[in-house]
């Protein structure tokens, strides 16, 4: 008869961002433990709150399944001595399996007889196996851990309770400094310690103590309560998904409520108000039916609605203090001059090994000018890029950004517009931070995109030049994100800027503040980001083939990878790649100084292939270019079928290799076809 298992780990308050991943990890690790220990089950349900992680297994088998395993030992000639007795090798083998030589039998494998033993292991009762389940808890990994009391061990947070129930039976286990039982803790303020009656009564037992153990249920409660407030008040609430996920992991018993603030604060830019409410206070933003910000907010209390009016007043008071700061900085910052702030950036350190922010901006300005030409920007756009590059970090010295650093760039745009700067310049100041996260929004204007590229390129080159290069998962200066941003921007705007030539030109620049170094490392780092951009959709061989192409143009490389992936599912892919691979491999033996001489052609196939290569224009999309190259496959095969490339005559051999070299020089702009796998 199957049983239900409950494991609950009661902890001190967990950081909100840790709760959901830890809940998932616990379920996965327990499932692995049960599977590895041959305990079948029907379902696993996980639970979490800020003060507990729990999992319930339904339909757990009473005992392990029996195990029968065959083990192969030494060959018969080694297992028996000259007298036909079992040798020490055979005896040691069976002893290692917990058996005797009586269990030995011989089986033939590919004409050779070997020792085999069969071991039968009866399944243990589930209760006995579960005595080792604390290894699941010990194996849990967390982004941070801590010591407490005088203990030598560490964990995400101090552990207060451990409950392990098999149906209604409490298992006796020890974990860290805690002995298991059936007592759990209720809500910190509304509940008390409570006894968990059985695995099945878990949610009900905690609910009686104002704890909703199921995170999905808490989320549904929050959303439903907010929707009710929307209807009652005739408003719209921005239910931001990230904020919702954070809030549900801050509360055990959610109660949503609406508060308000004075309408005068609506004169402050919306971004300031939203940042104050959402990022600093974890409040949901409220709008009218037209989408305009209202002087209200929605928050979620960790508790019931008892004395809710006092809670609302307290939350309003805290928010008003934030809004007062925002209003003050908004008013005072407008008294500042952009030129004065830019001048002060000489005293702001970009990095102690690299120099000041002003020096970083100077280098960025030079790079931006070069990129503007490469991207064929208009004269007006070039002017806007140059002006933006001169001032784009000024808002870092404003009071608003000093208080709300999330608003860097955003306030720069607003203050620039108030100061009379061109709209394109102001917008570029905001957009140069983009993308600010993996998959985040990209700049929408060419001016902003060029400034973003220039800023990220100098950041990348500067940190690499002083040896601050990411290693493993360590990337304290977010250089991977910056470089991924470079790749995404180039692809989004379709700018066919050869990265190798661009980086070469940047390394030729001379700055008093810094000399760029470690160019090879920079190029490999950029290639790695292009590789990541190709993603899982492109197999490793296709990614490597594209990365070894002769043209390091990001949009073309990504398009080539996509075209090759699609082509790999067609019937002509294998023969085309095989013929091209043969050509690529032979061309490696070519003398680069030798040009094709038609007078040395000895057959029509040489002439036909050479002419086809000369006529190969590689126009159109990546898919069309690939189709043009693949179309040469029959001509290449005909050439190989009728021509001895590695002829004894040196002149003939060099000429034929030169034909193949011409083919490779064109085809390699798409990919190194000899890196592709056709097996």
From Swiss-Prot:
* Taxonomy, superkingdom: Bacteria
Describe its assembly.
Tetramer of two alpha and two beta subunits.
Its BP terms in the Gene Ontology are: glycyl-tRNA aminoacylation
A single GO cellular-component term on record: cytosol
Q: Which InterPro entries does the protein's record reference?
A: Gly-tRNA-synth_bsu, Gly-tRNA-synth_heterodimer
Which PANTHER family does its entry note?
GLYCINE--TRNA LIGASE, CHLOROPLASTIC_MITOCHONDRIAL 2 (PTHR30075:SF2), GLYCYL-TRNA SYNTHETASE (PTHR30075)
Q: Please state where this protein is localized.
A: Cytoplasm
Q: What class of enzyme is it?
A: ligase
| Swiss-Prot/TrEMBL keywords | Aminoacyl-tRNA synthetase, ATP-binding, Cytoplasm, Ligase, Nucleotide-binding, Protein biosynthesis
Q: Known catalysed reaction(s)?
A: tRNA(Gly) + glycine + ATP = glycyl-tRNA(Gly) + AMP + diphosphate
Q: What is this protein called?
A: Glycine--tRNA ligase beta subunit
Principal location listed in the UniProt entry:
cytoplasm
Please name the HAMAP family in this protein's record.
Answer: Gly_tRNA_synth_beta
Entry-linked Pfam families: tRNA_synt_2f
GO molecular function per UniProt: ATP binding; glycine-tRNA ligase activity
The entry assigns this protein to a family as follows: Belongs to the class-II aminoacyl-tRNA synthetase family.
PROSITE patterns on file: AA_TRNA_LIGASE_II_GLYAB (PS50861)
EC number, UniProt record: 6.1.1.14
């Amino acid at each position: 008869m199957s049983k239900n298992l409950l494991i609950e780990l009661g902890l001190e308050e967990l950081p909100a961002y840790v709760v959901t991943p830890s809940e998932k990890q616990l379920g996965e690790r327990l499932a692995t433990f049960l599977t590895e220990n041959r305990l079948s089950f029907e379902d696993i349900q996980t639970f979490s709150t800020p003060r507990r992680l729990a999992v319930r297994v339904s339909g757990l088998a009473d005992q392990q399944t029996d195990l029968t395993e065959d083990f192969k030992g030494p060959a018969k000639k080694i297992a028996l001595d000259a007298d036909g007795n079992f040798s020490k090798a055979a005896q040691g083998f069976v002893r290692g399996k917990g058996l005797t030589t009586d269990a030995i039998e011989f089986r033939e494998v590919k004409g050779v007889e070997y020792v085999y033993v069969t071991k039968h292991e009866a399944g243990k009762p589930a209760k006995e196996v579960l005595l080792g389940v604390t290894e699941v808890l010990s194996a849990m990994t967390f982004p941070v851990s801590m010591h407490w009391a005088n203990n030598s061990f560490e964990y995400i947070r101090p552990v207060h309770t451990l409950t392990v129930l098999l149906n209604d039976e409490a298992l006796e286990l020890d974990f860290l400094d805690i002995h298991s039982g059936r007592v759990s803790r209720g809500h910190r303020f509304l509940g008390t310690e409570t006894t968990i009656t059985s695995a099945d009564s878990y949610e009900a037992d905690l609910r009686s103590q104002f704890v909703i153990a199921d995170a999905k249920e808490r989320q549904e409660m929050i959303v439903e309560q907010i929707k009710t407030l929307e209807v009652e008040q005739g408003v719209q609430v921005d239910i931001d998904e990230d904020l919702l996920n954070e809030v549900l992991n801050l509360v055990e018993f959610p109660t949503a409520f609406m508060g308000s603030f004075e309408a005068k604060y609506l004169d402050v830019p919306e971004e300031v108000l939203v940042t104050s409410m959402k990022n600093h206070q974890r409040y949901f933003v409220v709008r009218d039916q037209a989408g305009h910000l209202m002087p209200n907010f929605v928050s979620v209390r960790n508790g019931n609605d008892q004395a809710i009016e006092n809670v609302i007043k307290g939350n309003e008071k805290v928010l008003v203090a934030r809004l007062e700061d925002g209003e003050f900085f908004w008013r005072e910052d407008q008294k500042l001059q952009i030129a004065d702030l830019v001048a002060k950036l000489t005293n702001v350190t970009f990095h102690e090994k690299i120099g000041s922010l002003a020096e970083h901006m100077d280098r960025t300005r030079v790079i931006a000018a070069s990129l503007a030409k490469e991207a064929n920007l208009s004269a007006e756009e070039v002017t806007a890029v140059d002006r933006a590059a001169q001032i784009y970090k000024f808002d870092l010295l404003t009071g608003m950004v000093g208080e709300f650093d999330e608003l860097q760039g955003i306030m720069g745009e607003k203050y620039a517009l108030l100061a009379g700067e061109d709209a394109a310049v102001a917008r570029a100041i905001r957009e140069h931070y983009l993308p600010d996260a993996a998959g985040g929004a990209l700049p929408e204007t060419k001016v902003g995109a060029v400034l973003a590229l220039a800023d990220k390129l100098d950041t990348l080159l500067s940190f690499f030049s002083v040896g601050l290069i990411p290693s493993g998962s360590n990337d304290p200066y977010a250089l991977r994100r910056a470089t991924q941003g470079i790749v995404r921007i180039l692809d989004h705007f379709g700018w066919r800027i050869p990265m190798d030539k661009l980086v070469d030109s940047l390394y030729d620049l001379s700055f008093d503040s810094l000399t760029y170094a470690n160019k090879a490392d920079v190029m490999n780092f950029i290639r790695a980001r292009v590789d990541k951009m190709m993603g899982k959709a492109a197999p490793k061989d296709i990614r490597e083939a594209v990365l070894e192409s002769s043209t390091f143009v990001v949009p073309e490389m990504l398009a080539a990878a996509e075209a090759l992936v699609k082509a790999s599912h067609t019937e002509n892919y294998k023969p085309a790649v095989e013929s091209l691979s043969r050509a690529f491999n032979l061309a490696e033996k070519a003398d680069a100084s030798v040009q094709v001489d038609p007078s040395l052609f000895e057959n029509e196939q040489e002439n036909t292939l050479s002419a086809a290569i000369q006529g190969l224009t590689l126009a159109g999309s990546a898919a069309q270019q690939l189709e043009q190259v693949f179309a040469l496959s029959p001509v290449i095969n005909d050439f190989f079928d009728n021509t001895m490339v590695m002829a004894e005559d040196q002149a003939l051999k060099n000429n034929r290799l030169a034909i193949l070299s011409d083919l490779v020089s064109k085809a390699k702009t798409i990919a190194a076809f000899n890196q592709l796998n056709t097996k």
